């Protein structure tokens, strides 16, 4: 990732920025061997990452580094389940973020009036508050197309990128990063 960022900054294709990478892979309560429903509690997987991000990580970064702390200068992106975490965190803290990057994210859009607090059913508000919304995915089978289909015609502004010949993998996500970053903080 650092090579991608260094090259983009060096080529003046993006503004210099601080990039923080944290793992939202905070485990869910483990099921017991032989549990008839081993996926019980899966909805809680990574749920405490929200608290870590908002209550601990962002304040520590702002205290430690010379940052611009307003929402216009803060973006969040995530890959796979982290894409869903990104949407949950940003849409519940829209006063802190204005850019969303979803790289093969498991948005699992079902009902725009209910998903993510219903903000996707209010396109005027969403588009006013979110300066850039990016959805990227691997073209050889990945999350993305179903979410894009759910958003089409909704009035939500978003860009998409299909990584050719890749699936749910790091090459997809590196390509997504390369496409997403030049659109930040403009």
Regions found by a protein language model. Give the residues of each.
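Non-catalytic cap/lid and distal C-terminal segments of serine-dependent acyl enzymes
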Residues: 1-186
